[in-house]
Regions:
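Short, solvent-exposed mixed-charge patches
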Residues: 1-2, 232
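Active-site-proximal helix/loop segments of hydrolytic enzymes
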Residues: 3-4, 28-192
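Extracellular repeat turn/loop positions enriched in glycine and acidic/polar residues, especially those
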Residues: 10
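Glycine- and acidic-residue-enriched helix-capping/strand-helix junction motifs
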Residues: 17-31
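A generic structural signal for short
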Residues: 25-26, 50, 94-95, 200, ...
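Solvent-exposed beta-strand motifs enriched in subsets of small alpha/beta binding domains
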Residues: 186-232
């Protein structure tokens, strides 16, 4: 039976999330990365469900996740603080040893891109439970992934284009595959086409004779057939 992953694209709709370099909204980046992540998982024969596929408010995310009954769940987020802090961090449940393993696998693959590691972490609320609702209320082993700090120019450089958002998503997909013990299948390279713009000309020789009359006879035949022919 295929493994199942729930992908929560952080924020959305009226909730822009963090605001980064050039006024970029976290909600737009999380959606883009989540879509690329979904495509990567599909390529690896992993089933998935997304919390949202358009810019809509994040409604009933946990309920959707629990109804789907995934093997694991991942919430995609991006950080912001004071424009100086950098790095990726992955949160998991206080009460889940498996969560720590899962978080470590995902973080290691993000860090392999060159992002600074801020570690795998837990966060406790005043009641001694998990701080993040997504981690606290989700039945499956769940992570909240903070890919980088988008208000830091160096960190934002890891996600500032669609191509880089795809690279980030692929790193997360690798981490998921490693944890689920499923082979990660890289995207096949697109075939390239080449155009020959060479102006080089090639000559074709037909026949070689000791008797010039024989050469002239062949020349006449070639010209009669519509070919240019010279004797050298």
């Amino acid at each position: 039976m295929a493994k199942k992953v729930f992908i929560a694209a952080g924020h959305g709709g009226k909730d822009s999330g963090a605001i980064g370099v050039n006024g970029v909204y976290e909600k737009n980046l999380t959606l883009s990365i989540s879509k690329y992540l979904a495509a990567a998982l599909k390529r690896c024969s992993i089933e998935y469900q997304m919390s949202r596929t358009t810019d809509t408010d994040p409604v009933n995310t946990v309920a959707k996740c629990n109804k789907y009954k995934p093997d694991v769940a991942v919430a995609i987020h991006l950080n912001a603080y004071d424009k100086k802090v950098r790095g990726a961090e992955v949160f998991y449940s206080l009460f889940s040893a498996e969560g720590k393993k899962f978080a470590t696998s995902v973080l290691n693959n993000i860090v392999a891109l060159g992002v600074k590691s801020r570690g795998v972490k837990t966060k406790k609320n005043s009641n001694g439970r998990d701080w993040f609702e997504f981690i606290r209320e989700t039945d499956a082993t769940a992570l909240l992934v903070e890919c980088c700090f988008i208000d830091n120019a160096n960190d934002y450089n890891f996600v500032n284009t669609a191509a880089k958002q795809k690279i980030m998503a692929e790193a997360i997909a690798k981490g998921i595959c490693e944890y689920l013990k499923i082979e990660y299948i890289a995207e096949a390279p697109k075939p390239t086409t080449t155009t020959n713009n060479s102006t080089k000309l090639y000559r074709v020789q037909v026949g070689a004779f000791k008797d010039v009359n024989n050469a002239k006879a062949l020349q006449d035949k070639l010209k009669a057939a519509g070919y240019d022919a010279i004797i050298v």
